[in-house]
């Protein structure tokens, strides 16, 4: 661990964080998780209004901190958490747009892999293409927990894109034919940072919009009603923490 803290983006000490951090994009969702699911929640970061909290879930320490939007933003926060604060696990909890007929509004997509149109991996100077994938242990645990709560969920590839507004409206058709389930903007960078740091990451997304049916949820719904995804992530953090304590 590099002793480079507090950082320009996280005004905390390593002991302020639990080993597992839940990472929504929206700072208001971070606050929502802390206030509705954690006990003894303490604000540990508010630099640039990126709220971070640590509290207890079923007696186990869990942290939740926002990432902001896009790969550059989650790239900064996840890098600092993995490398400067020695966090072991980051679980992204966010929204995604469905791009497959089998996926429905408010379904959950667990990102086994994350395709991307970003050049984030160029920094590694690899002699080929890198395939960003989730931590198997986190993913396996999340799947078990999703089944236990009876969630409508899917496991497969996400598309992490750099562009929310794309000049070509049909660009997702090419990804759809490869079986990609949903599009979001963060998972690939998170998975690559985890791989490089030899740490663990997982993205659990709730479908907020549908690119085929044009259905959508409101910003308030995205902030306050995607609780099933939050519960799956918290239960995953709980099980992983217990396992590592034994």
Indicate residue ranges for each PLM-predicted region.
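Generic non-transmembrane alpha-helical segments
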Residues: 141-149, 193, 232-243
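Active-site rim beta-loop-alpha module in soluble metabolic enzymes
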Residues: 129-178
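Flexible, glycine/charged-enriched surface loops at secondary-structure junctions
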Residues: 39-46, 150-156, 241-246
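Metabolite-binding pocket within alpha/beta catalytic cores that recognizes anionic/polar moieties
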Residues: 1-137
